[in-house]
């Protein structure tokens, strides 16, 4: 067998009959499988041991040789080789066919490759192959030409003879008629009788004439067919063919069935044909040229690949190894078998019958019928159901053919090659583990024992608890007490991976240090739930064990949860306090006016109270019960840094040093909160809303090492839970208060609604107007009830606390609980004009309950659909971008894109761009950022973090040029500098990072949050597509619904307002021809945009428009943008449009992820003129390949090819990839494989998918070539200390925040310079 790590490419081609016979270990001659009495394989059958190898290790069929010592001997009695039984998984056989058959993939695929090669229509091809028509395979033109005159003379003689015969017959009949009539005359018969005789005589003469004419026509037909006879001509009329064969058999040959196709291919001159086709393409026009282009693709494929087209017609069929199509006995004595065995059996049966018929010399018609049946059975074996009705098994189920085994989700590619099951894994229910550190998880003892079994067994032997591995295994299985101690020792420092399905992004798998726990549930740290999207309502998680030292190192350094605090999509922290923790911290930092022990200033006779010399004193007071943590106090602080403005005021330019004292007016709770933050972090004197907490953690992530951030969020978690418990925030029915003003508010709106109803009944309003008015009224009513509710609730109400702290829920939900539900939609998505007036606290009436179910049901159905759609979108995105890997440090390009930092207002002030976080942030500057005076504020090549952006804004810079993957010039993949900072680590992206997959996950993961619907815009007929469908539409580069025209030129608008349509004409500024857009539906509305004077209004007559500007509401067609404005603009357009959808849902994704996908969509060029290159006109070529080939041609002073950029949807781009393995495992498997085989495609194994399929390490991360050859060798000391390492947590979370000594080096402090 090949070792998977030692080949560089994988080629697929057409197998000839010779290849098939070479692979084979013998011919399968009988359809039998096994003998049902002895259950042993039949000789020469489909499971024959002589062909495929023995069924039991080292044992021949007849039992003469049993034992490994006879290895390699071939038994002289039964002919079976003595070897391992596993060879039955790899040895193939073959069936020698009595007549050739065509391969259905090449004849029936779209387009039919055989048809294109031979220039035959698929319909004609089908007639030939299935014995419905003859085809002429060759004509001896010379001989025919030489003897044409003789043959013509013979034909004339024959025609003359027919005519003479006709004339003689007519003469004789006429005379007989005359005689008959004379006789009747003599007898004096009536005129009636005479007329009858005459009529019958004339009728007979007419028949004679017709018969002769038919014979003459037949001769004419035969002759004209013969004179025009040419190869590849079809003759459907069997009699005509027989006549031709009888008369002129020596001048031509013809046949039917696959044999005739085989003959045509044998005589086919590929080079000559290619030359003819190239000539047609150069000089032809229209349909002829198109057809020649399509044919040349197939012909050139055979010409260039050196494949023999004879492979499309088979003389032998390979039989796959028997273990891959097993026959197993079930418990009832019945057998279950793979469908392939049935299909092979049909082929063998028909083949044997055909051989017998040929030997017997059966009539041609019977033999042909048997050949047709053989062809059909081979078709069914290769691709059942592709032609005609599929062959069915018991219960009318179509049998699964070889093609079906590869196709689809259950096929070989997706089920077994890309989705393998893994050993050293387990799964269990998860429960919360609030006592864990961020990098720990609780692993049930029993599960850990099973997972680490080999390690435990080895260690038991090492420690002399067991004599050998076998007794160690017994000890483990019986769970002896010493096993647990050893287990504790073995799992120390050995990370495990936890995974929760669905794994929508890379944080769905993270590494943790296992802690042994009782019970059978895995304990999960509360802060990682956000990343896993886990909750504890019965979710399950899988555990995997990294085995090798390298795998453990990767798990520990790259995948440990405390190193994955930031989201790869937006670079913002995901490990944030949520729910209870937020409530706890919010409660802790709330200030309550006049609470127990609050600060009171000095009055005449009493001194001031609530003043403390240190936090310790305040805590003692709280413990004594004289001070509330939420009361305002004055306290002297020495270990907490004052806020910036106080620091400047008190400590001047030297700044605050630990130990310097200052007095803060704050609450004890806030002091306690600030003590959780790292030393030297400025004091935060605010109430901790969730957003404020997020901002703090964000800031920590920007400024401190990850290890500090991890420790801090862990402390916040502990504190949050502690204070949430102490706060006693719970929800009970008594907390849901209905506002007392609700009834009077509703009564007043009821009156207004009555008025509208009356107007409607009087006919003053039509139905739509009435509904609109009512919807408006009840929307107002709902808002007012909400307002009343807000005023009525006390500030310390638990529900309000939960909502206001940002822990969960929103005000709308509170209003639904206690106020009123308000308006709901019907199944069409329109508002029902009667609202739900009850709140859930009061209870709904039956009618209200019924109306409410519409929306609820639609929501559930929507969610289910959305999940499937979103998963499919992710799959396509991953497929198109999976080979985008960071390949080099810097591609040295000068190009970049301009991004906005701020907008300058009329009065000169700058308004910060709201989307700066996802556009400019975390990029590399492509050119110096210079202020108006010409000073460099940030130099080229610097990373734009928050401080740099602030510096630019302070210097009044409104836009900067940044590097982008859209302009990266790296051949395959991208360079680190163009990509910029990795969002997940906050550092420049590493070489080998699979940024394509990260991008696909970042876009696909929030897909389920996007809405499904297309929403109606206030009474406009045209739907505006939004949500998930819009994202799909953009990435698939489809023409959008409600497509809006864009200006092709810069110029003045002339607007004609028709009855139902607008007509817009643009008069170009450069005096060219005016561009007219007619039939623009009025329902779509004209576009509102900014005019030169800064005002915003609708497009009107005489306005000036720029090229590419949208003229109507709706979405521009990206293909139009590409045509009018070029590739750069369409890239920016796509990124902007995708971002709009995500922003509408409040999802933050960095532009760079979308750019990675968009770059893949614009990777190809379509060839317009091939020049001196090898490219075919109309073909799609990778841009890098196109440019390289053009450079080569120009260097040889030839004519370069001309091409234009083309925008491909992600599905099409995935299928057009250079890797046939990747494309075949994506979609349309048979089509991809057919194409690849004809072209003799070679897969260079550059992407990730191809390598996963063949089982190599993926060429990303540590699998990239430059790291591939680093082996991990433990040092002597490490070997000795292998099991004596102290626990991880001691050094990881030392109580003060100084870096502790010890074995663990935080990733941030680790220098990688020597590896690069």
UniProtKB/Swiss-Prot annotation:
Cystine bridges: none
* One GO biological process term: DNA-templated transcription
Residues recorded as binding Zn(2+) 1, renumbered to this chain, are 60, 62, 75, 78
Query: Carries keyword Nucleotide-binding?
Result: no
Enzyme Commission number, as recorded: 2.7.7.6
Swiss-Prot/TrEMBL keywords: DNA-directed RNA polymerase, Magnesium, Metal-binding, Nucleotidyltransferase, Transcription, Transferase, Zinc
Q: Please identify the protein, giving its name as recorded.
A: DNA-directed RNA polymerase subunit beta'
Give the organism, scientific name. Mycobacterium ulcerans (strain Agy99)
């Amino acid at each position: 067998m090949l070792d998977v790590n030692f080949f560089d490419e994988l080629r697929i081609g057409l197998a000839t009959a010779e290849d098939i016979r070479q692979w084979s270990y013998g011919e399968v001659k009988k359809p039998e499988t096994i003998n049902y009495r002895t259950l042993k394989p039949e000789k020469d059958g489909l499971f024959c041991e002589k062909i495929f190898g023995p069924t039991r290790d080292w044992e021949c069929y007849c039992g003469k040789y049993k034992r490994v010592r006879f290895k390699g001997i071939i038994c002289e009695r039964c002919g079976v080789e003595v070897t391992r039984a596993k060879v039955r998984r790899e040895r193939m056989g073959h069936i020698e066919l009595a007549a050739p058959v065509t391969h259905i993939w090449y004849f029936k695929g779209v387009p039919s490759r055989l048809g294109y090669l031979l220039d035959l229509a698929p319909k004609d091809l089908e007639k030939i192959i299935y014995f419905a028509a003859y085809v002429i395979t060759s004509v001896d033109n010379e001989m025919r030409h030489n003897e044409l005159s003789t043959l013509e003379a013979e034909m004339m003689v024959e025609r003359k003879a027919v005519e003479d015969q006709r004339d003689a017959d007519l003469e004789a009949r006429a005379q007989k008629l005359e005689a008959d009539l004379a006789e009747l005359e003599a007898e004096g018969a009536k005129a009636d009788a005479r007329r009858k005789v005459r009529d019958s005589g004339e009728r007979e003469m007419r028949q004679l004439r017709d018969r002769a004419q038919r014979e003459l026509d037949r001769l004419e037909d035969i002759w004209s067919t013969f004179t025009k006879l040419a190869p590849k001509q079809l003759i459907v009329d069997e009699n005509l063919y027989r006549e031709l064969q009888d008369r002129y058999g020596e001048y031509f040959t013809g046949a039917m069935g696959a044999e005739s196709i085989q003959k045509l291919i044998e005589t086919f001159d590929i080079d000559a044909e290619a030359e003819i086709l190239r000539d047609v393409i150069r000089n032809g026009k229209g349909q002829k040229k198109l057809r020649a282009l399509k044919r040349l693709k197939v012909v050139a494929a055979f010409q260039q690949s050196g494949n023999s087209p004879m492979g499309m017609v088979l003389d032998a069929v390979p039989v796959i190894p028997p273990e891959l199509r097993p026959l197993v006995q079930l418990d009832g004595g019945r057998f279950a078998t793979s469908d392939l065995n049935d299909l092979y059996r049909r082929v063998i049966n028909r083949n044997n019958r055909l051989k017998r018929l040929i030997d017997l010399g059966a009539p041609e018609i019977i033999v042909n019928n048997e050949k047709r049946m053989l062809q059909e059975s081979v078709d069914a074996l290769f691709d059942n159901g592709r032609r005609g009705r599929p062959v069915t098994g018991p219960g009318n189920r179509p049998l699964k053919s070889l093609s079906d085994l590869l196709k689809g989700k259950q096929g070989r590619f997706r089920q077994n090659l890309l989705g393998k099951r893994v050993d050293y894994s387990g799964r269990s229910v998860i429960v919360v583990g609030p006592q864990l550190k961020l990098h720990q998880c609780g692993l049930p003892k029993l599960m850990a024992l099973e997972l680490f079994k080999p390690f435990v067994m080895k260690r038991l032997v090492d420690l002399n608890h067991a004599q050998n591995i076998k007794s160690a295994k017994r000890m483990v299985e019986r769970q002896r007490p010493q096993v647990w101690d050893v287990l504790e020792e073995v799992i120390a420092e050995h990370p495990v991976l936890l995974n929760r399905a669905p794994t929508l992004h890379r944080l769905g798998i993270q590494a943790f240090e296992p802690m042994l726990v009782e019970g059978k549930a895995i304990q999960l740290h509360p802060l990682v739930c956000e990343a896993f999207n886990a909750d504890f309502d019965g979710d399950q998680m899988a555990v995997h064990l990294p085995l090798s030292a390298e795998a453990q190192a990767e798990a520990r350094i790259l995948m440990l949860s405390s190193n994955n605090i930031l989201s790869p999509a937006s670079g913002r922290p995901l490990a944030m306090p949520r729910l209870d923790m937020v409530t706890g911290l919010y409660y802790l930092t709330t200030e309550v006016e006049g609470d127990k022990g609050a600060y009171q200033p000095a009055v005449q006779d009493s001194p001031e109270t609530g003043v403390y010399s240190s936090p310790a004193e305040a805590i003692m007071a709280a413990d004594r019960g004289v001070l509330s943590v939420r009361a305002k106090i004055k306290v002297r602080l020495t270990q907490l840094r004052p806020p910036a403005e106080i620091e400047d005021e008190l400590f001047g330019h030297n700044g605050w040093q630990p130990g310097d004292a200052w007095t803060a007016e704050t609450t004890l709770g806030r002091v306690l909160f600030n003590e959780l933050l790292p030393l030297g972090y400025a004091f935060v004197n605010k109430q901790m809303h969730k957003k404020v907490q997020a901002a703090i953690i964000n800031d920590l992530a920007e400024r401190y090492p990850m290890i500090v951030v991890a420790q801090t969020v862990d402390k916040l978690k502990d504190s949050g839970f502690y204070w949430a418990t102490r706060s006693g925030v719970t929800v009970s029915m008594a907390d849901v208060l209905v506002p007392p003003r609700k009834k009077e508010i509703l009564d007043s709106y009821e009156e207004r609604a009555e008025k509208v109803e009356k107007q409607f009944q009087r006919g003053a309003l039509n139905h739509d107007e009435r509904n609109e008015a009512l919807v408006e009224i009840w929307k107002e009513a709902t808002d007012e009830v909400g307002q009343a509710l807000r005023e009525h609730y006390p500030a310390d109400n638990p529900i309000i606390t939960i909502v206001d702290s940002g822990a969960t829920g929103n005000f709308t939900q509170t209003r639904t609980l206690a106020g009123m539900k308000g308006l709901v939609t019907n199944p069409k998505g329109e508002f029902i004009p009667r609202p739900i007036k009850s709140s859930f606290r009061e209870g709904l009436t039956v009618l209200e309950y019924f109306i409410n179910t519409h929306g609820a049901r639609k929501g559930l159905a929507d969610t289910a659909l959305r999940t499937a759609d979103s998963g499919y979108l992710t799959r396509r995105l991953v497929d198109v971008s999976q080979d985008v890997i960071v390949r080099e440090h810097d591609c040295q390009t000068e190009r970049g894109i301009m991004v906005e930092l701020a907008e300058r207002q009329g009065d000169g002030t700058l308004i910060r761009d709201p989307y700066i976080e996802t556009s400019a942030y975390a990029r590399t500057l492509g050119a110096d950022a210079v202020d108006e005076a010409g000073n460099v504020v940030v130099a080229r090549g610097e990373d734009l973090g928050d401080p740099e952006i602030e510096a630019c804004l302070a210097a009044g810079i409104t836009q900067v040029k940044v590097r982008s993957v859209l302009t990266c010039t790296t051949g395959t993949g991208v360079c680190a500098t163009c990509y910029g900072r990795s969002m997940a680590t906050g550092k420049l992206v590493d070489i080998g990072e699979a940024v394509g997959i990260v991008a696909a996950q970042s876009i696909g993961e929030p897909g389920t949050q996007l809405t499904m619907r297309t929403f109606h815009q206030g009474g406009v007929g045209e739907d505006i597509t939004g949500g998930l469908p819009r994202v799909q539409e953009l990435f698939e580069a489809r023409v959008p619904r409600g497509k809006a025209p864009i200006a092709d030129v810069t110029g003045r608008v002339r607007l004609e307002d028709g009855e139902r349509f607008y007509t817009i004409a643009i008069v170009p500024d450069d005096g060219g021809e005016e561009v007219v857009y007619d039939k623009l539906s009025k329902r779509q509305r004209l576009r509102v945009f900014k005019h030169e004077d800064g005002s915003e209004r609708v497009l009107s007559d005489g306005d000036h428009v720029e090229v590419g500007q949208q003229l109507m509401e709706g979405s521009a067609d990206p293909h139009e943008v590409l045509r009018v404005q070029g590739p750069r603009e369409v890239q920016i357009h796509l990124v902007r449009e995708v971002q709009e959808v995500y922003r509408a849902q409040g999802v933050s994704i960095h532009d760079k992820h979308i750019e990675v996908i968009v770059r893949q969509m614009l990777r190809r060029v379509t060839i317009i003129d091939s020049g001196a290159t090898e490219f075919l006109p109309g073909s799609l070529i990778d841009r890098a390949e196109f440019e390289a080939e053009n450079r080569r041609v120009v260097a040889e002073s030839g004519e370069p090819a001309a091409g234009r950029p083309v925008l491909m949807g992600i599905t099409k781009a995935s299928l057009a990839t250079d890797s046939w393995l990747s494309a075949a495992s994506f979609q349309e498997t048979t089509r991809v494989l057919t194409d690849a085989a004809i072209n003799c495609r070679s897969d260079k194994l550059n992407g990730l998918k191809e390598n996963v399929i063949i089982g190599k390490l993926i060429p990303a991360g540590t699998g990239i070539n430059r790291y591939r050859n680093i082996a991990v060798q433990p040092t002597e000391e490490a070997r000795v200390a292998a099991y004596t390492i102290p626990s991880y947590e001691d050094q990881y979370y030392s109580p003060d925040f100084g870096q502790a000594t010890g074995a663990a080096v935080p990733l941030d402090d680790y220098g990688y310079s020597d590896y690069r």
